[in-house]
Each structure stands twice: as structure tokens, then as C-alpha cells.
Amino acid sequence: KNKMNDWLVAEHQKRFNAPPDFFTAGGFAAASAALTALTKAGSSDTEKLIAAMEGMDFDTPKGKMTFRKEDHQAMQSMYHFRIKKAQAGEWDLLELVREIPASELPVPVRNKR
């Protein structure tokens, strides 16, 4: 959980009377990345945005993400969940087993700049 996620869930529920889906969080993350890059670059110039985004950290509903400098891949922690046997409510489905930090994920760099 984080403040951005809490806000997104509350606003989505208020506006659409339903929780956000997976795609909503992804779109929100993309918008957060764009806003962070524009703020950091101080410009909409392509080369300045590229320089600003390489290695840039930005907040998302799923936690911090980082654009890897080597290939511009967005990296984030992954979450290992277990489905709960006993659920306290309609959306009380998962139990977090562990968080796997992005730094521990062996995603190869194939397309170097």
C-alpha cells in the first residue's frame, strides 16, 4: 500500500462505483512517469526528456519504478501472493508472501542504447 494507490482506489471507487483494474494502475503509472520526466527535464525537448528519464525513479500505485539507463526498461518490485482460504470481504483475496525488489530480478539487458 502507498498514498498514491490509496488515492487512486478511492477516486476510482467514487467516480465509477467500482475498484480500478490492472490497466488503470498501468495508465496511472505512465502518466506519473511522464509528469516526473517533464518536471525533471524542465522541458518537452526529446533529448532532454531521454536524459531525464534514464535512471529516473518515479512513484506509481504499485510502488516505486525506475527506468533502467541501459535499455530504458521500467523496473519495479514484483509481489508473490497466496490466495486466502478465509476472506474477510469481497476484495480480501490475497495474502502477501514476499516482495521481490527490482534489484533482485535477473531481467537481462538485451537492447543497449
Regions found by a protein language model. Name each.
Residues 1-113:
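Extracytosolic ligand-binding ectodomains
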